[in-house]
């Protein structure tokens, strides 16, 4: 009741504060924003391996991670890495290494695909029967990335970031849900 009063009657809002530590959801937000900045460039590009390799050779990955941190965590697009605390420098390094050492080299080496969507809402109805009655269940969510493979397969990519430990076990672990 008191929260309702402050929010709806008195129109008071809690100040937006920046937490001292980057929690798992914010880590995921930073990673997803960086991937979106980088991969937006290759949406619709057939066999984007060379473009990805070019991004890896230049400073584009680090710049995308910094932009994602500035927009989503610091909420200051003019900030630079010199403004980062030790914890934020660590997050920047982990996200950059995750992209430069895993996701992007893997995609560059296995580039028989075309990115068709980023952060796209998807929904799928699944029909089944239970106790002789036809039922329908809807699965819905946001796909981090959707690729059309050369063989006609549609691939939905989910960057796993919600685990409490932020370790990268290898590219294959991305596809096992680890």
Where do the language-model regions lie?
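C-terminal, charged and often intrinsically disordered regions of DNA end-processing helicases
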Residues: 1-41
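Residue-level signature of transmembrane alpha-helix interfaces in integral membrane proteins
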Residues: 15-16, 48, 174
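Active-site-adjacent bridging/hinge elements
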Residues: 2-13, 69-74, 154-170
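A non-catalytic, helix-rich entry segment at domain boundaries
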Residues: 34-119, 123-129
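Mg2+/Mn2+-dependent nuclease catalytic core
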Residues: 122-178
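Secondary-structure capping and boundary motifs in well-ordered enzyme cores
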Residues: 1-2, 19-30, 57-65, 69, ...
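Conserved helicase NTPase motor core
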Residues: 31, 111-117, 134, 145, ...
């Amino acid at each position: 009741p008191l929260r309702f009063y402050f929010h709806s009657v008195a129109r008071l809002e809690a100040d937006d504060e920046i937490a001292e530590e980057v929690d798992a959801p914010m880590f995921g937000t930073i990673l997803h924003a960086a991937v979106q900045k980088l991969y937006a460039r290759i949406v619709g590009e057939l066999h984007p391996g060379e473009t990805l390799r070019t991004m890896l050779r230049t400073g584009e990955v680090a710049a995308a991670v910094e932009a994602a941190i500035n927009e989503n965590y610091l909420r200051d697009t003019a900030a630079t890495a010199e403004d980062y605390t030790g914890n934020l420098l660590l997050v920047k390094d982990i996200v950059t290494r995750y992209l430069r050492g895993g996701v992007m080299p893997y995609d560059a080496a296995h580039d028989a695909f075309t990115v068709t969507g980023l952060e796209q809402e998807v929904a799928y109805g699944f029909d089944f029967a239970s106790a002789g009655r036809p039922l329908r269940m809807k699965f819905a969510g946001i796909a981090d990335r959707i690729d059309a493979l050369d063989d006609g397969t549609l691939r939905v990519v989910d960057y796993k970031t919600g685990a409490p430990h932020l370790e990268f076990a290898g590219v294959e672990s991305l596809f096992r849900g680890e």
